[in-house]
Amino acid sequence: KESRQFGSQRRESEKKAVATALENLAMSAGFSDVNRMTWYLESEKLKELTPLFEGVNLDGVILRLEIDGEGNASLAVEKGGKPLKTLPKALSKNETALRLKETVKELKEQKHRAGESLERAMMESTVFRVDELEKILDNPVLAPQASGLVWTLEHTNGFLQKTDTGLILQDIRGSRHSLKQDAGLRVSHPHDLITAGEWADYMHVLYEEKRKQPFKQVFREY
């Protein structure tokens, strides 16, 4: 029993040490927290994957990374212009094919982590700069999650949209508020929506438009 307790305490201590090291690394790199550093690094990594989205030809079989409108990554396989349901056995040990499969796994994990990070940001009232939100909306894995959430700018709540002229916040009445570069937004908490008398309205919108959220934000018990 004492051995198990010691092992548990040691793991917890190591976990805290890693968290502290990551926080120090983020601060040293000029980020205010670990989440921001992680999102930046993952977005930069996504840029490096651009050729894989265009497709790789392996002995006449085209493999291509795809990300759908909900941020879900998958590996598309086709031969002779026709889609294949599975990867041919001849390519099962091909290094490029294995790398693509591993990349799909990493992108799925990235989506999961992002959902947890955004929920934590809501609970901690983390403020995001407009330039940070622009980068998030440029990331096809993160964008659907951020777009599905309600955001708060001072006393205005709404959904984020990216336009040719910049970010806007569209409120529950359909009014579009342009966001200045120095604006600070946070993920709305149900308390914000209740205070504004808009909680039921956003529930209705999410239900009618079948909007998906990365975590229970609007339909959260409060």
Language-model features: locations:
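Non-catalytic terminal/accessory regions
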Residues: K1-Y222
